[in-house]
């Protein structure tokens, strides 16, 4: 019974719509009304501005970390359950009960789970994420390559549970980014205003 309640609580934590709350309360905007209409960090940066976007990023990471830490907080099981419970927060973020089962793509929330489970891998994942953005100028590309490399690294270090969960997250994030992947193939994906590929595109237009 306690474990079931923990999963429900993790889902509810993940369901907290950080982007919508910050947008409405502090910016008097709803990120769902502009840009990509997504409630996550990237669109929050675009619609609400860098300060609000950064706040959304940290809150979404915190959601994953807090939800994944519930088994330890309630002393219910071993450290491995952190990853499994964390998945409930990912589902909550993507299909929030507070937003009629719509939501974001759960990249930051997934990273928060990794922070709770293995802080070193979180740092590695963050470094990969930033590096890919600086090269490709695409958040969507970084959102897929990051978990892919973490899954490979996990299997290489014989952390089979993390490797399995990272693979599941990779599949889920790939599905959530299916429209972005189509735009990448067509050469029409949105770029952040920095990075090597962005500079290349700017020079090409001149």
Swiss-Prot record:
InterPro entries: G3P_acylTferase_PlsY. It catalyses: an acyl phosphate + sn-glycerol 3-phosphate = a 1-acyl-sn-glycero-3-phosphate + phosphate. Pathway: Lipid metabolism; phospholipid metabolism. Probably interacts with PlsX. HAMAP family: PlsY. One of its GO terms (cellular component) is plasma membrane. It is found in: Cell membrane. Its main location: membrane. GO terms for molecular function: acyl-phosphate glycerol-3-phosphate acyltransferase activity. Keywords: Cell membrane, Lipid biosynthesis, Lipid metabolism, Membrane, Phospholipid biosynthesis, Phospholipid metabolism, Transferase, Transmembrane, Transmembrane helix. The keyword Acetylation does not apply. The keyword tRNA processing does not apply. The chain crosses the membrane at residues 3-23, 47-67, 79-99, 119-139, 152-172. Catalyzes the transfer of an acyl group from acyl-phosphate (acyl-PO(4)) to glycerol-3-phosphate (G3P) to form lysophosphatidic acid (LPA). This enzyme utilizes acyl-phosphate as fatty acyl donor, but not acyl-CoA or acyl-ACP. This is Glycerol-3-phosphate acyltransferase. Belongs to the PlsY family.
